[in-house]
A protein has these predicted regions:
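Peripheral terminal and inter-domain segments
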Residues: 1-165
Length: 165
């Protein structure tokens, strides 16, 4: 498995439209299922477990992101967690990652990995009437799609749409 790279951005950072906590919550998609994003201030037992896992891994990595983040557990065959790092506006860089907060085997050093060939995607959140209604993912195919090029609304141009529950 490949080690995750440091998250960097070359675009000027523009703040979020709402507080980060407003972007936390459960999101659903009929094909991908549901997951819950936690902000660093998430207080539920689920969020405390997720934050603890990421904190353990990030504490031993020099390349850990220092930007605003949303974090989620997402146990699948190719990943155990999702890390969404704020880029600009309502856009986040989404990384599917596998966390080993207690190490593996005899080595108890926490670490994070990602499958070779998986690409990061961009999540663009949509806010209507002061509330987050969902987000769309683009970049899953690794190149600009016809939908991205020709459609105006986020929901129409993304590869996958998640509704906020």
């Amino acid at each position: 498995m490949a080690e995750k790279k440091a998250v960097t951005s070359h675009e000027p950072v523009v703040g979020l439209e709402l507080e980060l906590e407003e972007f936390s919550g459960t999101y659903t998609n009929p094909g991908y299922g549901a997951f819950t994003f936690c902000s660093p201030s998430g207080s539920s037992s689920y969020c405390q477990d997720v934050i603890s896992d990421f904190t353990a891994v990030d504490s031993v990595q020099s390349s850990a992101p220092h930007s605003l983040q949303l974090l989620a557990a997402w146990p699948r065959i190719w990943a155990s967690h999702i890390r969404a790092v704020h880029q600009s506006g309502n856009k986040f860089l989404v990384q599917w990652t596998s966390l080993f907060p207690e190490g593996y085997g005899r080595d108890i050093t926490p670490f994070e990995t990602a499958e070779i060939g998986t690409s990061d995607a961009t999540a663009e959140f949509v806010v209507e009437d002061g509330k987050v209604v969902g987000f769309g993912l683009v970049g899953l195919v690794g190149q600009l799609t016809e939908r991205e090029r020709t459609h105006a609304t986020v929901k129409d141009r993304v590869d996958v749409w998640f509704d906020k529950a």
